[in-house]
């Protein structure tokens, strides 16, 4: 099994351990030689910023050492893992399905098209963030979140205009720190009262 993982992922060792307990040989594909073999295993060095080249590198590895399954171990590796599985004709979710689920604004569009309820929202393009004309259209409280991060990273409630402006700036900084290749758009959506699970 091929695990596609960033070198800083805390999940990789758990997946390798689970594979060992099940008798499954694991190989790690990562964007750093340091993260390739936490247990001395061979690995495949890939560039997460260029998925096409990453898929080709893994395809070349597969030609020498066949892979029977591919698994992305965190949100940022799921699309590459799905693309690899598709290229190698392995079972997996389709890359477009992964992207639609990961990118919050795309997921909201799909839910609306299907007639399912979801919060009202607005997508801010990076160039819109410095222009405050749209702020008058916002209802408070609202929630600010990056379209591309998971695990509640960058999700901030804003109760008034000043908090909204500060939240947008904070999310921009989080996105820059996380990965320079991430989608920079920000979602501003209706706040829905209730328990978060």
For each of these PLM feature ranges, what is it?
Residues 1-97, 128-130:
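ATP-binding N-terminal substructure of ATP-dependent carboxylate-amine bond-forming enzymes
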Residues 5-7, 30-32, 146-147, 160, ...:
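Fold-independent oxyanion-binding glycine-rich loops
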Residues 22-24, 138-140, 153, 182-183:
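Short coil/turn connectors at secondary-structure junctions
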Residues 53-57, 107, 167:
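Hydrophobic alpha-helical packing elements
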Residues 61-67, 135-138, 181:
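Glycine-rich phosphate-binding loop signature in dinucleotide/nucleotide-binding domains
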Residues 86-154, 161:
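A conserved helix-loop-beta module that forms one wall/lid of the active-site cleft
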Residues 117-119, 141-144, 157-193:
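Conserved ATP-binding module of the ATP-grasp superfamily
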Residues 196-197:
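A short beta-strand signature within small-molecule sensing/ligand-binding domains used
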């Amino acid at each position: 099994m091929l695990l596609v993982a960033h070198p800083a992922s805390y999940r990789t060792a758990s997946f390798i351990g689970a594979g060992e307990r099940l008798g499954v040989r694991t190989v790690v594909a990562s964007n750093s030689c340091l993260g390739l073999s936490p247990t001395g295993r061979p690995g495949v060095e890939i560039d997460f910023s260029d998925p096409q080249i990453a898929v080709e590198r893994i395809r070349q590895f597969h030609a020498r050492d066949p892979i029977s399954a591919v698994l992305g171990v965190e949100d940022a590796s799921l699309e590459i893992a799905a693309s690899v599985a598709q290229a190698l004709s392995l079972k997996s979710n389709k890359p477009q399905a992964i992207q639609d689920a990961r990118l919050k604004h795309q997921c909201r569009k799909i839910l609306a098209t299907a007639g399912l309820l979801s919060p009202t929202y607005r997508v801010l393009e990076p160039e819109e963030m410095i222009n405050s004309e749209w702020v008058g259209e916002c209802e408070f409280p609202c929630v600010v979140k990056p379209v591309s991060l998971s695990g509640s990273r960058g999700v901030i409630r804003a109760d008034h205009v000043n908090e909204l402006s500060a939240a947008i700036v904070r999310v921009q900084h989080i996105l820059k720190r996380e990965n320079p290749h991430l989608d920079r758009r920000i979602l501003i959506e209706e706040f829905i009262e209730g328990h978060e699970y």
